[in-house]
Amino acid sequence: MATFSIRRYSRQGLWSLFLTCAFPLHFWTLILVFRDISWLTERTNAWDAIGVASYGMIFAFAESVVVFLVTALLGFLTPKQWEPERRIAFLGLLILITSVWGMIAQLLFLWNIFLPAQAIQFLRSSSHPLRIIYAACLVVVTPTVLLPIYAFIRSNKAIMFMQNLMERLSLLTMFYLFFDLLGLIIVITRNIG
């Protein structure tokens, strides 16, 4: 079993994959924290706002671990002949694409962007509104997923680009992990005191 997983992944590759999984979750958590910190401070005080931010960072770390484990397991579905570096870059690409769509979905909710009234009326009058919604989502999402994957599979430049991007994001993510540690210390301090 150990030799099987070593052929699929290297230790450095798994660390790089974890950092890639952690980056979008921490980035988005920090954006939401900075968005909400002012009204939290006004509502309570700065120490409570820092506590809420700390819980957010700890939760982002826990999410990162879960996403990493699922992604690493999905890596076993990739072609066996791929080198570990290529597999890690491919999985990183999938994580980043999925994360961008997750952020877009949450932004639409946060900005209160809904379907226009005409579209809602059309969906009400149709016999299968969910099918229409799913088809529309499929038309929008599919190219944004398949085109980068196709470019990745066909082009060595895309593979190199993804590997370089993951390497650059790794340094920033290490900084985010430091914030996780600070958040854990703050949460422990707040709960003890």
Question: Predicted regions: what is each one?
Answer:
Residues 24, 59-75, 134-152:
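Hydrophobic cores of alpha-helical transmembrane segments in multi-pass inner/ER membrane proteins
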Residues 7-10, 78-89, 156-166:
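Membrane-interface helix-boundary motifs at transmembrane edges
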Residues 37-56, 112-129, 187-193:
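Membrane-interface interhelical loops and short amphipathic "cap" helices
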Residues 81-142:
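Membrane-proximal helix-loop-helix units in multi-pass membrane proteins
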Residues 17-28, 91-106, 177-178:
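Hydrophobic alpha-helical membrane-insertion segments
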Residues 3-21, 164-171:
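N-terminal membrane topogenic signal
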Residues 165-191:
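Final/C-terminal transmembrane alpha-helix of multipass membrane proteins
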Residues 22-39, 184-186:
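Alpha-helical transmembrane segments of multi-pass membrane proteins
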